[in-house]
């Protein structure tokens, strides 16, 4: 069985605005079924969605059992107003508003909570993020509130201090995790954080002219080196493509290929262990 522990059913890997517009007047069931058929044909038995506020992931979860797939979704991801994530998630201004949204997720039947706590990689400039992460105290409160409500927490997080803060706060999984240093990697390993590095979002940019290829190569090399280091620390790693992101189609197998390249002969055992932990925590 294959796992993809980070997808966005609402997106299509080509144009995020057009992809979202496809579902603005109602979720297109035929589209969702087509993607599920693709995953089924490739042997995927578990999918974890990063969320959307239009109900696309929710419908996919409802339909997935027909295709022999276990599907988990946070419904809409939660992001702080004025920071990255508003294009796909629900915004909050204060921790009180965040807590109310988490409680709402419980009533709506979310499987877990997804938080956005940093910016994105700038694929034209190695080492640069589009914005700084949230402060350590805020991250700690976000994780605590969701855990108090009984949810596991998936965190979009880049940058060493942001990821370290998330790990120390007890976050259940870190997504992306660009530009980590030894302290951040050790914090995740010691806390038992599952890292989903989404290498496909970088590797699939190679050979395309949208971004500076020198920067893309440097970013990918850095990420793969950190994957190797994290594995050597005994850290938990799980495969997740971020399917739907630009140049990452649904049903992509590139994540497995990149992680095999980074991890070597033990790659299957390492990924199976991490994926099973994702399945357990985000049940």
List each model region and its residues.
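Active-site gating loops and adjacent loop-to-helix segments of metal-dependent hydrolytic enzymes
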Residues: 8-31, 68, 73-87, 120-135, ...
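Glycine-rich anion/phosphate-binding loops
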Residues: 52, 90-100
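Histidine/acidic residue-rich metal-binding segments in metalloenzymes
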Residues: 96-116, 122-195, 216-237, 282
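Active-site environment of divalent metal-dependent phosphoester hydrolases
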Residues: 8-12, 53-57, 79-81, 119-123, ...
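Divalent metal-dependent hydrolysis catalytic cores, especially in the metallo-beta-lactamase
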Residues: 29-58, 68-78, 110-123, 152, ...
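Metal-associated gating/positioning segment near the N- to mid-region
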Residues: 2-63, 82-84
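His/Asp/Glu-enriched, well-ordered alpha-helical/loop segment
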Residues: 220-283
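Histidine/acidic-residue-rich catalytic or RNA/ligand-binding cores of hydrolases
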Residues: 13-17, 163-169, 202-213, 223, ...
């Amino acid at each position: 069985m294959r796992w993809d522990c980070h997808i966005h059913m609402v997106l299509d890997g080509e144009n995020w605005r057009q992809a979202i517009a496809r579902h603005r007047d109602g979720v297109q069931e035929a589209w969702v079924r087509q993607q599920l058929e693709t995953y089924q044909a490739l042997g995927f038995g578990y999918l974890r969605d990063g969320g959307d506020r239009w109900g696309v992931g929710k419908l996919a979860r409802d339909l997935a059992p027909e295709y022999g797939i276990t599907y988990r979704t946070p419904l809409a991801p939660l992001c702080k107003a004025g920071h990255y994530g508003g294009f796909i998630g629900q915004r909050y201004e204060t921790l009180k508003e965040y807590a109310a949204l988490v409680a709402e997720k419980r009533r709506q039947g979310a499987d877990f909570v997804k938080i956005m706590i940093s910016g994105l990689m700038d694929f034209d400039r190695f080492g640069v993020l589009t914005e700084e992460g949230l402060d350590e105290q805020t991250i700690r409160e976000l994780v605590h509130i969701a855990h108090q409500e009984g949810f596991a927490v998936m965190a979009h997080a880049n940058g060493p201090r942001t990821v370290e803060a998330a790990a120390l706060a007890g976050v259940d999984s870190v997504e992306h995790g660009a530009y980590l240093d030894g302290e951040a990697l050790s914090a995740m390993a010691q806390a038992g954080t599952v890292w989903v590095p989404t290498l496909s979002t970088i590797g699939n940019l190679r050979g395309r002219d949208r971004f500076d290829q020198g920067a893309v190569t440097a970013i990918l090399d850095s990420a793969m080196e950190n994957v190797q280091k994290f594995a050597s620390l005994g850290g938990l790693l799980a495969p997740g493509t971020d399917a739907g992101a630009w140049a990452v189609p649904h049903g992509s197998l590139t994540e497995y290929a990149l992680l095999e390249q980074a991890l070597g002969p033990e790659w299957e055992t390492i990924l199976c262990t991490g994926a099973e932990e994702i399945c357990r925590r985000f049940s």
